[in-house]
């Protein structure tokens, strides 16, 4: 629950009060790594169809981002974007600097946990 509490507090700090107390989680990009048979299909939606004041993001997913930023055993994988919650404008800047995760995690051990960007709506 620690991660979700952190995520909700940061979301509230950046966006103020939102319609939902707990966000609904989505992923940006291609999440079909083939390793999770419980996810046989995807729903593709345009990001611009969502009001920006309803969106926050973590890079990678929130359950990985916070531990990478705070636990010593993840020091070697830590990047400036870990442990942060971003607005739409902020995540655009992060992607402009670091790129989308894509498949880099498969070939680069330093990107091992950075498989996708999580969107919280």
Residue ranges and their predicted role:
Residues 1-21:
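ADP-ribose/NAD+-binding catalytic cleft of ART/PARP-like enzymes
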Residues 20-22, 33-41, 48-121:
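Conserved NAD+-utilizing ADP-ribose enzyme module
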Residues 29:
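Conserved catalytic/binding loops enriched for acidic/polar residues
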């Amino acid at each position: 629950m620690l991660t979700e509490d952190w995520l909700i507090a940061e979301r509230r700090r950046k966006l103020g009060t939102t319609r939902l107390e707990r966000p609904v989680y989505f992923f940006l990009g291609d999440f079909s790594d083939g390793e999770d048979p419980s996810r046989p299909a995807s729903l593709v939606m345009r990001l611009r169809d969502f009001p920006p004041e309803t969106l926050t993001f973590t890079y990678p997913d929130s359950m990985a981002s916070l531990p990478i930023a705070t636990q010593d055993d993840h020091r070697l994988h830590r990047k400036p974007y870990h442990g942060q919650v971003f607005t739409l404008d902020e995540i655009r800047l992060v992607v402009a600097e670091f790129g989308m995760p894509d498949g880099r995690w498969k070939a680069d051990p330093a990107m091992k946990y950075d498989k996708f960007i999580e969107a919280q709506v």
